[in-house]
Amino acid sequence: MNTLNQQYEEKVRPCIDLIDSLRSLGVEKDLALPAIAVIGDQSSGKSSVLEALSGVALPRGSGIVTRCPLELKMKRKKEGEEWYGKISYQDYEEEIEVPADVEKKIREAQDKMAGNGVEIADDLISLEIASPDVPDLTLIALPGIARVAVKKQPENIGDQIKRLIQKFIKKQETINLVVVPCNMDIATTEALKMAQEVDPDGERTLVILTKPDLVKKGTEETVIDIVHNEVIHLKKGYMIVKCRGQKEITEKVSLPEAIEREKAFFKDHAYFHTLYNDGHATVPKLAEKLTLGLVHHIERSLPRLEEQIEEKLEQTRAELERYGNGPPTDPAEKLVFLTDKVTAFTQDAIRLTTGEELKCGDGLNVFSTLRTEFMKWNAHLNHLGEIFGKRIEREVAQYEEKYRGRELPSFINYKTFEVIAKEQIKQLEELAVKRLKNIGDAVMKVFIQLAKSSFTGFPNLLEKAMTKINYIKNRNESTAESMLRTQFKMELLVYSQDRTYSSSLSDRKREEQQREVDSDQGSVISDNEERSIVYSTDNHATLQELMVHLKSYYKIASQRLADQIPMVIRYQMLQQSAIQLQREMMQVLQDKEKSEVLLKEDFDIGSKRAAFQCRLERLMKARRFLTEF
C-alpha cells in the first residue's frame, strides 16, 4: 500500500515515532506538537477514509459517532508480520487481539469517557495499529460537525463540537485534513469554513473529496476544477477518494477489496481518470501524500519545538523554585526543614533593612516607600513654613495687639518670640504621628509580603509569622510615637547653637532686604506715602524684626525635624522590627511539638508542585528524545 522508496521510508518512521513518543509522554499538555487533524461535517465520509487508511472498522452510524478525539497511530510492518492493535485512554491500556474488535473497544472507551449517551469529551483516545497494510502515519480524528441537536443531545452540542475542533485546528503546528463529499457545495461546507478561519491563506489545509460515485451528471468538470485547485486555492491542495459505501459494508466487501474497486473506479471513469493519472486520487495516494506531508511538517517544526521545550523547562524550574520543596516525612528532618525556612525568612527581613538582595520576595523594596514618605514629610514642613511666614506678614497688626507687652517700640520681647515659635512647632506633632502610622502600615505590608513569599503553601506557618509581624508593628509603633512626642516636647525648649542661629538669621535678613529692594525698584513714592512708611516702620519695627527671627528659627527647627522624625521612624519601624521579628520567629522553633502543625502544607500547593514536577520530568524526557533523534 505504501509506495515510498526504501531510502525515504527509513526516515519516515523515526520522525513519526518521535512525535508519537512526545505525545504519549503528555508533552501536548505543555506545547503544540505537529499533527494532522481530520475534520468534517456529519456523514461526510470521514470514518470511511480513516477505515480505508487503517484497515480496521471504526464506529459508524447516524448522528455523532466520534465522541472523543481519536489519535490513530498507524505503523507499517514488514510483509508477513502479524497485525497488532492497542487502545489506551486516561490511565487505561489494552491490547486488541483481532481487527474486528477495534470498533467495539472504541465505543467502550467513548462510553467510559463521555458517558453512555450522545455527549462528547475532550480527552484523547489513542488507537495504535501496526500492520503490513497500513502507512506510517498518525492522525487525530475529531467529532463530526453537528448543525442541530437530536434525540438526547444537549442544545449546544454544535457549539461544544466546534470548540473542541477549534482547540486542535487553531494550532499552527496542525495540518487540517478537511473531508468534503463531492456532491456538496464545497463553498458552504462548515468544516472548510472553520479551517479557513484559522488558516486563511490555506498554508496548512488539505481537502479530501469523498463519494465521487454520487456526483451528479454534468458536474464532473466542477469536481476536477476543485481538485486542480482552481476554485478555492489551498497550498496543500486536494485529493479525491472512493471508500466503502453502506451497500459494500452490507455486502461485507473487505477493505483490501474496496481499495482495488476504488482503483478500478478512477482508472475507468470517463472524467476522473485524469485525476488518477495525476496522482490526486485513491486512498494509497492519499496515504503517501499524508505521510510525506507529515514528515516534512515535523522536520520543519523540530527547531521551534526544541526552543519551546527549553522555554517551558525554564518556566517550570522557576515555578518549582517558587513553590519550594515539600516538607520531609522524618521528624528530625522536618525540624531542620522548618529551621531553614524560618532562618531564610528572618535573614531576608534583616536584608530588607539594609537594601540587600533577598532570597525570597523578588521585587520587595521598603526603601522606595520610605524615601517617598520622608520626602513628603520634608515637603510638608517646607509648605507649612511658607504658610506660617505669609500668615505672619498678613496678620502683623493682630500679632502686635495679641503679643506686645509693656515694652517700647523697636524692642523684641523674647517671650513673644518663644510663644509664637512653640505654637507653630506644636502644630507639626500630630502630622508626624500620622506619618509614623502610614509608614508603619507600609512596612508591615512589606514584611507580610515577604512572609507570603517565604512560606508559600504553609498556611499555619504564615499565620504565625503574620501574627508576630502585627504584634511587633503595634508595639514598635507605640514606642516610636512616644519617642516622637518626646522629640516635640524637646522642640518646645526653643534651642539652637548660637552660630547656627546667627547664620540662619543673617541669611534671612539678606533675603528680606533683597525682597524690599526688588519691590521698591521702579516705584514712585509721594510725600504722603513716605510719611506713612516712616510711621509704619516706627510702629511695627518690633514685629518686622520678630518675623525675621521666627522665619529663621522655623527653618532650623524644620530642618532638624526633617531628619529626626524619619530617623526615629526608620529605627523603630524597620530596624528594630526586623531584629525583633528574627527573635520572635526563632522562639517559635523552640516548641518542637508544634512543628508538625506549622509544616502542614496547603493541599493545592502540594498538588501544583507535583504537577510541575511531572511536567519537568516529561519535558526532560522530551528534550532527551529530541537530542537522540
Curated annotation (Swiss-Prot):
**Residue span, GED domain:** 543-629
Cross-referenced Pfam families, in alphabetical order? Dynamin_M, Dynamin_N, GED
Stretch forming the signal peptide:
none
Stretch list, region G5 motif: 242-245
Stretch list, region G3 motif: 141-144
Q: What is its main location?
A: cytoplasm
Q: Which GO terms describe its cellular component?
A: cytoplasm; microtubule; nucleus; plasma membrane; presynapse
Ranges for the region named G2 motif are 65-67
Spans annotated as G1 motif: 40-47
- Compartmental location: Cytoplasm
User: Quick one: a GO biological-process term for this protein?
Assistant: defense response to virus
Q: Using the UniProt annotation, give all residue ranges assigned to the region (G4 motif).
A: 210-213
Alphabetical keyword list: Cytoplasm, GTP-binding, Nucleotide-binding
Origin superkingdom: Eukaryota
Which residues are involved in binding GTP? 40-47, 141-145, 210-213
> What InterPro entries would the database entry show?
Dynamin (IPR022812), Dynamin_GTPase (IPR001401), Dynamin_GTPase_CS (IPR019762), Dynamin_N (IPR045063), Dynamin_stalk (IPR000375), G_DYNAMIN_dom (IPR030381), GED (IPR003130), GED_dom (IPR020850)
Family, as annotated: Belongs to the TRAFAC class dynamin-like GTPase superfamily. Dynamin/Fzo/YdjA family.
Q: What protein name applies here? A: Interferon-induced GTP-binding protein Mx
Q: Which organism does this record belong to?
A: Larimichthys crocea
Recite the lineage of the species. Eukaryota, Metazoa, Chordata, Craniata, Vertebrata
Name of the coding gene:
mx
